[in-house]
UniProtKB/Swiss-Prot annotation:
Activity regulation remarks: Magnesium-independent phospholipid phosphatase. Insensitive to N-ethylmaleimide. Inhibited by sphingosine, zinc ions and modestly by propanolol.
Main subcellular location of this protein, as a coarse class: membrane
Lineage of the species this protein comes from: Eukaryota, Metazoa, Chordata, Craniata, Vertebrata
GO terms of biological process kind: Bergmann glial cell differentiation; blood vessel development; cell-cell adhesion; cell-cell adhesion mediated by integrin; ceramide metabolic process; gastrulation with mouth forming second; integrin-mediated signaling pathway; phospholipid dephosphorylation
Catalysed reaction, written as an equation: a 1,2-diacyl-sn-glycero-3-phosphate + H2O = a 1,2-diacyl-sn-glycerol + phosphate; 1,2-dihexadecanoyl-sn-glycero-3-phosphate + H2O = 1,2-dihexadecanoyl-sn-glycerol + phosphate; 1,2-di-(9Z-octadecenoyl)-sn-glycero-3-phosphate + H2O = 1,2-di-(9Z-octadecenoyl)-sn-glycerol + phosphate; a monoacyl-sn-glycero-3-phosphate + H2O = a monoacylglycerol + phosphate
Span of the annotated motif Dityrosine basolateral targeting motif: 109-110
Protein known as: Phospholipid phosphatase 3
Keyword annotations of the record: Cell membrane, Endoplasmic reticulum, Glycoprotein, Golgi apparatus, Hydrolase, Lipid metabolism, Membrane, Phosphoprotein, Transmembrane, Transmembrane helix
CDD domains, sorted: PAP2_wunen
Region Mediates interaction with CTNND1: start-end pairs: 275-311
Membrane topology: Multi-pass membrane protein
Post-translational modification: N-glycosylated. Contains high-mannose oligosaccharides.
GO cellular component: adherens junction; basolateral plasma membrane; endoplasmic reticulum exit site; endoplasmic reticulum membrane; endoplasmic reticulum-Golgi intermediate compartment membrane; Golgi apparatus; Golgi membrane; membrane
Record-annotated site: Stabilizes the active site histidine for nucleophilic attack: D255
């Protein structure tokens, strides 16, 4: 009986899960890899395009009115900030990227775990994880700026910056829409961008993303409480950043809460639906060859039994 090997039945082009062009033509495979990288960069650019347009153009926020007796917008303007934009970006981005670099290098060097079309495992790991993180940053900032210019909520220090001429305003009308600000126009436009807090959304996104990254990559069991301590510290940093905006008279408490919710939502969506941090690795296995059993008729079975009995 002929010994049939299942491996011979596999079409050569289907081995290694690819076509002959990908398996035997490295030039075409390399061009496809470059095309995919360019597509990823294009998607990253498009995700951050609303943020870039709003920040670099003269788009003005929605012109919202106010009530003369609204105490929530009568706070004085503070000259300094507890956490300015430079510190926020430096801490949020630098800490997250350094943690990702450390985690991926440890994972590849010590655990020998890396699967990617990019040949260098270190470059491949950083490309995937840092790319996903920056993609989420772009989405979060675009969401924030779109909300700011669309809603135009007045900051707590709006009247201090606007300095309207109340002698020309009839407060008995209730909601005042027709008014003119005598303050600096750039500061007035910035004072119309209260909802929602960009500091709260950005800090929550970066820190929660890092918390989830530690949950997926920090596998050392030596210190049971070390990982929860690090995660708690990161979340508290995000909370402090958002709450400082209330004490600085930059945002209302509801602005900060909305920013926290938006940053957390984007972080969870990026981690669970875009990145592969919590995705189980599945391998495609070919089915085992079927075992052919010899089928005998009842007469052949009787003859075979008689043959054994005679022996």
């Amino acid at each position: 009986m002929q010994n049939y090997k299942y491996d011979k039945a596999i079409v050569p082009e289907s081995k290694n899960g690819g076509s002959p062009a990908l398996n035997n033509n490295p030039r075409r495979s390399g061009s496809k890899r470059v095309l995919l990288i360019c597509l990823d960069l294009f998607c990253l650019f498009m995700a951050g395009l609303p943020f870039l347009i709003i920040e670099t153009s003269t788009i003005k926020p929605y012109h919202r009115g106010f009530y003369c007796n609204d105490e929530s917008i009568k706070y004085p303007l503070k000259t300094g900030e507890t956490i300015n934009d430079a510190v926020l970006c430096a801490v949020g981005i630098v800490i997250a990227i350094l943690a990702i670099i450390t985690g991926e290098f440890y994972r590849i060097y010590y655990l020998k775990k890396s699967r990617s079309t990019i040949q260098n495992p270190y470059v491949a790991a950083l490309y995937k994880q840092v790319g996903c993180f920056l993609f989420g940053c772009a989405i979060s900032q675009s969401f924030t700026d779109i909300a700011k210019v669309s809603i135009g909520r007045l900051r707590p220090h709006f009247l201090s910056v606007c300095n309207p001429d109340f002698s020309q305003i009839n407060c008995s009308e209730g909601y005042i829409q027709n008014y003119r600000c005598r303050g600096d126009d750039s500061k007035v436009q910035e004072a119309r961008k209260s909802f929602f807090s960009g500091h709260a959304s950005f800090s929550m996104y970066t820190m929660l993303y890092l918390v989830l990254y530690l949950q997926a990559r920090f596998t050392w069991r030596g210190a049971r409480l070390l990982r929860p301590l690090l995660q708690f510290t990161l979340i508290m940093m995000a909370f402090y950043t958002g709450l400082s905006r209330v004490s600085d008279h930059k945002h209302h408490p509801s602005d900060v809460l909305a920013g926290f919710a938006q940053g957390a939502l984007v972080a969870c969506c990026i981690v669970f639906f875009v990145s592969d941090l919590f995705k189980t690795k599945t391998t495609l296995s070919l089915p085992a060859p079927a075992i052919r059993k010899e089928i005998l008729s009842p007469v052949d079975i009787i003859d075979r039994n008689n043959h054994h009995n005679m022996m």
